[in-house]
């Protein structure tokens, strides 16, 4: 089943020039894509190529300048109030900048309960039980429930944001560089959790990343973005190779996971 369909999407931002006239900076140009239930897809590209802007459009935080976005066959622009609430529950996003994604005055307990209060019909006790369950799933415990964001490390806060998104059991989870910043052990744990969710609920995942290792370990398909356009799409197999210049540049930039000791024949 197709969850999300994007056709001919373009987007620009207006900014003032020296003449006082508004100039338009194109960020996305004729982007088309589709995501199916249970699918894991990567959107791969360098910083500044338009990946995060596309993500904001997909979750409805901004409206595109041109083109269409449909959720389960319904255009986002035509969703009624009830449908929009269901859409906000079904599609969740975890941002790269976790500090800006939470209220620093709220406790972790309040942060986790917030989407459940607004999007689910759960009693308070059920919300608290699910909050504990989600924390455990991302390798945190109840000791952080009464802490506030400034009291957490960056990795802990990122996992809190992931737990918050998972608490409403979304149909599609968009992760904007949200896993790449975790260390390899935590990253592996999160990936195991996401695989489990896919098996249980058919959750689809869209990884927005520049981390090719993450793509090769977890994704079934990868789209390469460059200068606001998707320049190629590849199925991820045993040997992932790219035909576009942008894809090859990213592939050549990958460093080994561990340092390689060079042998030397020089005598001291």
From Swiss-Prot:
Under the heading Pfam families, the entry gives: ABC_tran
**Which keywords does this chain's UniProt record carry?**
ATP-binding, Cell inner membrane, Cell membrane, Ion transport, Membrane, Nickel, Nickel transport, Nucleotide-binding, Translocase, Transport
Q: InterPro entries given for it? A: AAA+_ATPase, ABC_transp_ATP-bind, ABC_transporter-like_ATP-bd, ABC_transporter-like_CS, Nickel_NikE, P-loop_NTPase
Q: Where in the cell is it found?
A: Cell inner membrane
Give the catalysed reaction(s), semicolon-separated. Ni(2+)(out) + ATP + H2O = Ni(2+)(in) + ADP + phosphate + H(+)
Q: How does it assemble?
A: The complex is composed of two ATP-binding proteins (NikD and NikE), two transmembrane proteins (NikB and NikC) and a solute-binding protein (NikA).
- Name it: Nickel import ATP-binding protein NikE
Tell me what organism the protein belongs to. Escherichia coli O6:H1 (strain CFT073 / ATCC 700928 / UPEC)
